UniProtKB/Swiss-Prot annotation:
This is LAS seventeen-binding protein 5. Residues 15-161 form the VHS domain. It comes from Saccharomyces cerevisiae (strain ATCC 204508 / S288c). The keyword Nucleotide-binding does not apply. Essential for the organization of the actin cytoskeleton, fluid phase endocytosis and vesicle trafficking, together with YSC84.
Length: 354
């Protein structure tokens, strides 16, 4: 703790800052030691203070961090929640929730005063909806630990649903999503050890020892997401379009995002124990996404309408139409990685790459 600091700054903050700032650390591996740090003091007061410190560290990296730090901080928070860790104080921290809400709805700028990157906005919104689904699926709506996250998810989902209905009534494109045109998530694995030549020529490299836990988790999430989407479609009333059902649509968005991660690992994993499982996971996701498309509303609009831009008040990318993204941590290397903006505001368009 600094001499003039009003807030504690212990190993908890140092650990969070370290593991979200570099891809050299596998979050799934670092999670357990971090949980132990937060739970180290069994005294109720210290336990509360530790959670407050963790929430503050997460918020700082979301607010002031570069894109890598923001992305990995969201991933770390998702791991806490998805693994069933009940940190009541951390999950209900008002400032953290406000920052997440502002990011997910694109209503607040980063600490530098600039707009958040579209990919970060999409990621935060997708996580907020997935946390809401996790809470409802496990009947945790009345659990005090998740009350803040539940309200956050509802807010994001309502904003998305409102913009989606507005597009349908205002002539936005409907019909099939063309999800098979989705590209792999090229932000999922970009090792800091890659040379400029590696980045320029897109040479696939992966450290299986570090990535194995993450691959297992993604395979598990992919299969669970496919089943969840299929189940939501089975429960649709006869004659109701999948695109008109909020639950089915949110599960479709999740499944599509996870499939992009699976596709990325299929580019990197060419042999070994995970290859067959990744192929199977992709097949299951494709089947579920296709089933959603088969139940979607069709219209007579031309294919070109899928390429239109939308102003939905949530994902305003007009100011973010960059042809490439330069990471503030390593601008020379990151400038070699192209950035292609997408239109999350139209979850059924060709350019939607969650």
């Amino acid at each position: 703790m600094g001499f003039l600091s009003d807030h504690p700054h212990t190993a908890i903050t140092e650990t969070i800052f370290r593991i979200v700032s570099s891809r050299d650390y596998t979050l799934e591996v670092e999670l357990a030691p971090l949980i132990q740090l937060i739970k180290a003091d069994h005294n109720d007061y210290n336990y509360t203070v530790n959670q407050e410190e963790a929430a503050r560290a997460l918020r700082k990296k979301i607010k002031y961090g570069n894109r890598l730090q923001q992305s990995r901080t969201l991933d770390l928070l998702d791991l806490f929640i998805s693994q069933g860790v009940k940190f009541t104080v951390m999950y209900n921290d008002d400032k953290l929730l406000q920052r997440l809400r502002g990011m997910a709805t694109n209503s607040e700028n980063s600490g530098s005063g600039e707009k958040y990157e579209p990919r970060i906005i999409k990621k935060c919104a997708a996580y907020a909806i997935s946390w809401l689904n996790y809470i409802t699926q496990n009947n945790l709506e009345n659990a005090r630990a998740y009350s803040g996250l539940y309200q956050l998810g509802q807010t994001v989902k309502q904003r998305y649903s409102k913009s989606s209905r507005s597009r349908r009534s205002g002539g936005g494109s409907g019909g099939r999503s063309n999800f098979m045109d989705d590209s792999a998530d090229d932000t999922l694995y970009q090792s800091n050890s890659l040379t400029s030549a590696d980045r320029l020529y897109r040479i696939p490299q992966i450290n299986m020892n570090k990535e194995a836990p993450r691959i297992r988790l993604i395979i598990s999430d992919a299969l669970a997401s496919a089943v969840s989407l299929q189940n939501s479609l089975i429960g649709l009333p006869k004659g109701k379009f999948s695109t008109d059902d909020e639950e089915a649509t949110s599960k479709f968005i999740q499944a599509r995002a996870i499939r992009r991660k699976v596709l990325r690992y299929l580019q990197l994993v060419t042999e070994g124990e995970f290859l067959g499982s990744l192929i199977h996971a992709n097949d299951e996701l494709v089947a579920a996404l296709t089933a959603y498309d088969d139940r979607s509303a069709q219209d007579d609009s031309s294919d070109e309408s899928d390429h239109g831009s939308y102003d939905d008040g949530i994902y305003d990318e007009n100011e973010q139409d960059n042809s490439r993204y330069i990471d503030s941590e390593s601008s020379e290397e990151e400038s070699l990685s192209s950035y292609q903006p997408s239109t999350i505001s139209n979850p059924f368009g060709d350019h939607n790459k969650i």
